[in-house]
Curated annotation (Swiss-Prot):
Name of this protein: Zinc finger protein basonuclin-2
Top-rank taxon, per record: Eukaryota
Extent of Acidic residues compositional bias: 648-661, 982-995
Gene Ontology CC: chromatin; fibrillar center; nuclear body; nucleus
Length: 1099
């Protein structure tokens, strides 16, 4: 694209102007001598040819004008070049002479190609009706013009260009060519560029694009070429406006304005529609606050010397007031950020008026600063720096109240001069040495003088920009003096650095200054504007936020630089993303997802007495803060955003199931005695607990158990989810997550000891006795099926799963037991959200848990392992201590030996001891596994070990198995015999995470309860697996020895990590997988487990 004019500026494109010579007469223009020919004769002949050509062009003018008038008569016609008479305007530079010299023809000769993707248009051809549409490809003018525009500012955002007339012409054509109106934002920016050009250049650009100066100042064309008043105007589209806005980032004069427009675009989306009575309210507000331009200012402007007025103001009929304020007076950049009434212009040559000291502290005086600007001279080059200064400036005191205009416009620290002390200091400096400082510039913020404007700019950036850079993390109000410090802070993944409530005292002054002063901080704001220029990098303000899983973390976040500076900032077209959207989560095993918490949760600060443990940080439900779990490892490059969407059924299931995913001891008393009136649930992991008839006559107080349950299982519910989230990605946390089955066995042993030592005690025990240490958590056997399956709640099952779960639990009596108050009364509601200690009611169960944590924390939590008297202020610390096998190994083995000597439990001691030894020593103690895997043991002995309960448990649980057979095949792998021996006896059906066996196997177990060999080793294997699986405690992988929270997670681990090391059942049609060869062989050799399979032959 080009600049048009008789004297093209240097470095312009090779476009022909109307007064430039043709190719035939360039030798005459340059007076090139020819050998043997009289040069004077040649010059005279060429001059005659030139005159004749000009006469011919003059004759063609009327005909061309008639053609253009006929073309304008079309209904859909848009503005084109030379459609109106402009000779009456000052500075008229001539019109186009013929079609051969038309601007579009010259542009077509330069091959302005279309930049859209997959468009093969090689040259823009203006449409016959709409000039901005190409006749060849039907694409717009902007898409073609981008081929000639520079895009270096997108890749080098720190560099700015000098405003040149040919570049301004190119950018002006994007919005003025073929249009009849200019968007307001683009006109503001173009006005700013025009203000640094000469008058002749501005007029030449406008006339070259078919606009008059009057129409441009008005913002739209009033009449067409035929004199008809227009009532409809052609204007560029919004997408083209956004692309054009990017071009103004090339210049220091408009860069900061474009950045402010991006901020206002985000803020303007939430502006409400004004009411009908706004006009009167606005008039009242303006008159009462008197914030408009003072009459003296207007008088000064109207009566000022024309020689000192900018050329852009010299417009007939006083159209200068249609321009923005800065064009009326060519003030420098630092003062452009002030409100319109912040300056009082004086006539050139007048001295600075020095107010007396007595009037400086009076707030009823005028709040305008008095400025004596340097007169503008046409022979001077306008200052193009983003930060300039003005000499002879003396701010007066500002009123105590800050106007809304000041709050909304980001300005520099000049408002700090509202204090009388600052004004007095400037006044004193001005009085002391005004004569000696002639030619120097001084800082408007602190009053110091400097040798030149460059030094002032360096000083201003280094000293007075300390509150210009706010942290880009949404909700963090930290401010910094440099972009480097701000970016380093913003990139820190520690969420506590961005929490307002944990702010250090050293930051309060900056924050108070930021919020109290009239100088807002330029913060990074996410805009919804998005437009990708075809064939180019993204050109919109921002691109839509990408999927957090697919988005890689950016090296630094985008921030808008200071208004008056050119700071190193990242590319402006980059998207503004929150830290949560930029996080790239580490690849980890699938675990139970986080159940979002409700937005109405009461927020209680954690008590100071609670020790710092890897606990979960409760998400503060402020709209500006998204906090990450405190336990998340620092390997995560950015904090993880916890989504706040509410799953309606989450609370319902949490309340109904009493968090079955929690680890801990579940007291299931299978006694049919009338002393116990609560419903109990049956779970495969709890079959060891009912081990003798001696214990069946014992009842533990339901009051204390319910109280312990309400204070433990519900409180740990949110913490378990976060543990599941992080345990697979951080193996070293496995020891901390071993909170499941150790509780079961330790508390069972504790219960056995208490019952054996006190055989004659009453059935109900007082609330102050040690029974409070026994906490009750109910493991619903339908939990895995309804929550962890591929159709479960966590995977999108939703309400249908909720209804199905409710029907199952109601029909099979697996629902949550009834709640009891401390007095033993049955509560009316299944889950009354009340505190069982102080009887207070809350809105949600989560509020109850917070209440327990903050109010009833004085009740210490004793270790659940019998014989260990360690007490902790938090359940999390107690559970972590209780789950540590190394701390209780000697204690547990000693108690087991004592229990083995008890003659009242002959059939229990060996079985229970083996169970504990398996758990305590794991794969390092194969004796327990050998006892378990003794396939030749008689079924009667096995059944006597189980006391008849294990079989019923397995039958009832297997009835609920809804698994389907899988066609997955896995290759067997050979590994050490020790790993094979240490494998789990329980099979894993690969396509059903939650089922323990396939449908045929479970059906057979359900319908053959009396077969002596039908359960045998399989039931013992199920017990062994459940002894490792608790409800949410440590389940050890027998291959890699990692700990997992539940059986579902372990099965997924087997499927994703150890699939090649699993061993498939040899019976055709049976898809059971085993982690050891011995377990697989014992399963494959049991014909009773494969009756319903079509092919029952064993390989």
């Amino acid at each position: 694209m080009a600049h048009l004019g008789p004297t093209p500026p240097p470095h312009s494109l090779n476009y022909k102007s109307e007064d430039r010579l043709s190719e035939q007469d360039w030798p005459a223009y340059f007076k090139v001598p020819c050998c043997g020919v009289d040069t004077s004769q040649i010059e005279s002949e060429e001059a005659e040819v030139d005159v004749r050509e000009r006469e011919t062009q003059r004759d063609r003018e009327p005909k061309r004008a008639r053609d253009l008038t006929l073309r304008d008569s079309c209904t859909d016609n848009s503005m084109q070049f030379g459609t109106r008479t402009t000779t009456a305007e000052p500075g008229f530079m001539g019109t186009w002479q013929n079609a051969d010299t038309n601007l579009l023809f010259r542009m077509s000769q330069q091959a302005i190609r279309c930049t859209l993707v997959n468009c093969t248009c090689e040259c823009f051809q203006p449409g016959k009706i709409n000039l901005r549409t190409c006749d060849q490809c039907k694409h717009g003018w902007v898409a073609h013009a981008l081929d000639k525009l520079s895009t270096q500012h997108l890749y080098h955002p720190t560099q700015v260009e000098i405003v040149q007339s040919n570049v301004v012409f190119d950018i002006s054509s994007l919005m003025l060519y073929g249009t009849q109106a200019v968007p307001v934002r683009l006109k503001i920016l173009l006005d700013r560029l025009f203000s640094v050009l000469k008058q002749e250049e501005v007029l030449h650009i406008l006339h070259g694009l078919g606009w008059t100066l009057r129409d441009y100042v008005r913002g739209y064309i009033l009449q067409d070429a035929a004199g008809k008043v227009l009532d409809r105007w052609a204007i560029m589209s919004r997408e083209e406006e956004i692309i054009t806005l990017q071009q103004f980032l090339r210049f220091g004069e408009t860069k900061s304005i474009v950045e402010l427009m991006a901020i206002q675009e985000k803020e303007g989306q939430a502006v409400a529609v004004p009411s009908s009575k706004t006009d009167s309210d606005i008039r009242t507000f303006i008159e009462s606050n008197n914030r408009t331009r003072s009459p003296s200012l207007l008088a000064h402007l109207e009566n000022s010397n024309p020689s000192s007025i900018h050329h852009f103001e010299n417009i007939p009929n006083s159209l200068a007031f249609l321009l923005p304020f800065q064009y009326i007076n060519p003030v420098s950049a630092p003062l452009l950020g002030l409100p319109p009434n912040g300056l009082l212009l004086e006539q050139p040559g007048l001295r600075l008026r020095e107010p007396s000291l007595s009037t400086q502290n009076e707030y009823n005086e005028s709040s305008e600063s008095e400025v004596s600007p340097t007169p503008y001279k046409n022979d001077q080059t306008p200052n193009r720096n983003a930060l300039t200064s003005i000499t002879n400036v003396e701010p007066k005191t500002e009123p105590a109240c800050v106007s809304p205009i000041q709050n909304s416009a980001p300005v520099s620290d000049l408002t700090k001069t509202e204090h009388p002390k600052s004004s007095f200091r400037i006044h004193r400096m001005r009085r002391m040495g005004s004569a000696s400082r002639k030619g120097r510039v001084f800082c408007n913020a602190c009053g110091k003088t400097f040798y030149d404007k460059g030094t002032l700019k360096i000083h201003y950036n280094a000293v007075h920009l300390k509150i210009k850079h706010r942290c880009t993390i949404e909700g963090c109000n930290m401010v910094f003096s440099s972009l480097r410090s701000r970016n380093r802070h913003s990139a820190n993944p520690n969420p506590r650095l961005h929490m307002p409530m944990l702010r250090n005292n050293r930051d309060k002054d900056l924050i108070r200054a930021t919020s109290g002063a009239a100088t807002p901080v330029i913060a990074s704001t996410k805009s919804n504007l998005a437009l990708t220029s075809p064939g180019r990098p993204p050109m919109g303000f921002t691109t839509p936020p990408l999927d957090p899983v697919l988005q890689n973390p950016l090296p630094s976040q985008l921030v808008f630089s200071g208004l008056k500076t050119v700071q190193p900032v990242p590319p402006f077209y980059r998207s503004l993303l929150t830290p949560g959207e930029m996080v790239s989560p580490p690849t980890s095993l699938p675990t139970s997802p986080i159940i979002p918490t409700s937005g109405t949760i009461e927020q209680h600060p954690p008590p100071p007495s609670e020790p710092v443990v890897p606990a979960v940080m409760m998400a503060t439900h402020e709209p500006s803060a998204d906090l990450a779990p405190k336990k998340k490892p620092r390997k995560s490059s950015m904090p993880v955003k916890i989504e706040k969407e509410i799953i309606d059924t989450a609370d319902e299931f949490d309340d109904e199931d009493d968090d079955p995913n929690d680890g801990g001891a579940v007291v299931n008393d299978m006694s049919h005695d009338n002393h116990c009136h609560s419903q109990e649930e049956m779970s495969p992991g709890m079959s060891v607990k009912d081990f003798s008839k001696h214990n069946r006559t014992r009842c533990i107080s339901r009051t204390e158990i319910r109280r312990a349950d309400s204070m433990t299982s519900e409180d740990q519910e949110p913490e378990r989810d976060y543990e599941n989230e992080s345990e697979s990605s951080e193996p070293k946390l496995g020891e901390e997550s071993m909170e499941g089955d150790e509780h079961i066995h330790s508390e069972v042993s504790e219960k056995v000891l208490m019952n054996s030592e006190r055989p004659d005690e009453n059935h109900s025990e007082p609330s102050h006795q040690d029974v409070i240490k026994v906490k009750e958590e109910f493991t619903d056997p339908t939990y895995d099926m309804f929550y962890m399956s591929q159709y479960g709640l966590y995977n999108g099952g939703g309400a249908s799963m909720a209804a199905l779960h409710e029907s199952f639990t109601s029909s099979l009596n697996y629902g949550s037991p009834q709640k009891f108050s401390p007095e033993g009364d049955l509560c009316s509601s299944p889950d009354p959200k009340i505190c069982y200690v102080c009887k207070k009611s809350f809105k949600s169960s989560y509020s109850v848990k917070l209440h327990y944590r903050n109010v009833h924390l004085k009740e210490m939590h004793v270790c659940t392992v019998a014989g260990c008297n360690a007490a902790f202020p938090s359940r999390r610390s107690r559970d972590r201590h209780s789950a540590n096998i190394n701390l209780h190994r000697k204690l547990l083995t000693k108690e087991l030996d004592d229990m083995g000597l008890d003659s009242s439990q002959p059939s229990l001691s060996k079985d229970l001891r083996d169970e504990f030894l398996v758990k305590i020593y794991g794969a390092q103690h194969p004796m327990g596994l050998d006892v378990r895997e003794d396939a030749s043991s008689p079924a009667g002995t096995e059944d006597s070990h189980l006391n008849g309960y294990g079989r019923g448990m397995a039958e009832d649980y297997m009835v609920l198995d809804l698994s389907t057979t899988s066609s997955l095949q896995s290759s067997s792998s050979i590994h050490s015999s020790r790993e094979s021996d240490a494998g789990s006896d329980e099979g894993i059906l690969l396509d059903d995470i939650d089922g323990a066996s396939d449908s045929g196997e479970s059906a057979h177990k359900a319908e053959a309860p009396a077969l002596p060999g039908s359960l045998g080793a399989e039931v013992s294997g199920s017990l062994m697996f459940s002894s490792l699986s608790g409800s949410n405690g440590g389940i050890m992988c027998n291959i890699c020895h990692k700990m997992y929270s539940n059986k579902g997670t372990l099965r997924v681990h087997y499927k994703t990590v150890h699939l090649r090391e699993m061993h498939k059942c040899k019976v055709p049609g049976c898809n059971m997988m085993f982690s050891s060869v011995r377990s697989r062989n014992r399963h494959s050799q049991n014909p009773n487990l494969h009756k319903n399979i079509p092919f029952t032959s064993v390989d």
